[in-house]
Amino acid sequence: MNQIEKTGELSASRFTVRDFTELVKIGIVNSNTITAFTGMWLAFQLNGISFIQNVDVIFFTIVGSALIVAASGAFNNVIDRDIDGIMERTKNRPTMTGKISGKRALMVALVLGVVGTIMLFMTTWQAGVLGVIGVFLYVVVYSLYAKRKLVSNTVIGSFSGAVPPLIGWFAVEPSFSIVPIMLFLVMFCWQPPHFYAIAIKRKEEYAAAGIPMLPVVKGIERTKKSMFFWVILLTILPFFMFELGIVYVVLATLLNIGWLALSIYGFKMEDSIKWAKWMFVYSLNYMTILFVAMVVISIFL
């Protein structure tokens, strides 16, 4: 038993709600639950399905989605214990301070994952399968392999991060249409510029931990070009979402133009760290405004 495990056993009584929320990465849980809800809401609204008469579906979808994302975060914390202590932003995670032992964190992850998956299967089998795929992609493909081995790790990790809105949609309407595809693509294209902004700010930490993030391997200027590329892709997507109405298309386009302008400004701005902070903040506001707008605008369609 290593020192972290010993400390974890001794401090088990100090396992608090805050420790739990840090273990499951509550911020990521919240943001992914919002996208899952949006997918579910749009499936109700655009297919003429009663929201009120499907309270059970709503409950199982939202809670199930939150639980599998929480499980994925906990699994990731267990896997990353060898590198979390090196990085400033992760060195105080409960699995590093000993407040939660590796064994206990693994048990929490397994329980959350199993319960969440069962709940998703109680909606439709498609939603359940998507949940399993999402966890597998994040835990096995990304956390265990791509994150540590490939410079394309962020793009690969974006597949799992784009699954929640699909889960929400398929829990209600288990068939493909342009809207769930676009929701997936929005989330997929949004993640690289968002996480590359973090990687630029934390470049030295990632380098010390041996994580081949794009800024570490290819440099900041190359990363700026990649971020610009992904934002350009985002600017195209609203024009495939006229089913949500012209108001949404205009709003999304304006948000995209703003992000595109900020991306271009990065090539002229000398302080790349400050620019990366701006990009990070913009990405958070972008996602929040965009998905809230989808929900609100769809009410009036």
From Swiss-Prot:
Q: Name one GO biological process term.
A: heme O biosynthetic process
Q: Which InterPro entries match?
A: Protohaem_IX_farnesylTrfase, UbiA_prenyltransferase, UbiA_prenylTrfase_CS, UbiA_sf
Q: Which UniProt keywords apply?
A: Cell membrane, Heme biosynthesis, Membrane, Transferase, Transmembrane, Transmembrane helix
Segments traversing the membrane = 20-42, 55-75, 105-125, 126-146, 150-172, 176-198, 227-247, 249-269, 280-300
| EC nos | 2.5.1.141
**Family matches, as HAMAP family:** CyoE_CtaB
Q: Which family, according to UniProt?
A: Belongs to the UbiA prenyltransferase family. Protoheme IX farnesyltransferase subfamily.
Q: What does this protein do?
A: Converts heme B (protoheme IX) to heme O by substitution of the vinyl group on carbon 2 of heme B porphyrin ring with a hydroxyethyl farnesyl side group.
Remarks, miscellaneous: Carbon 2 of the heme B porphyrin ring is defined according to the Fischer nomenclature.
Q: What is this protein called?
A: Protoheme IX farnesyltransferase
Organism the protein comes from: Listeria monocytogenes serotype 4a (strain HCC23)
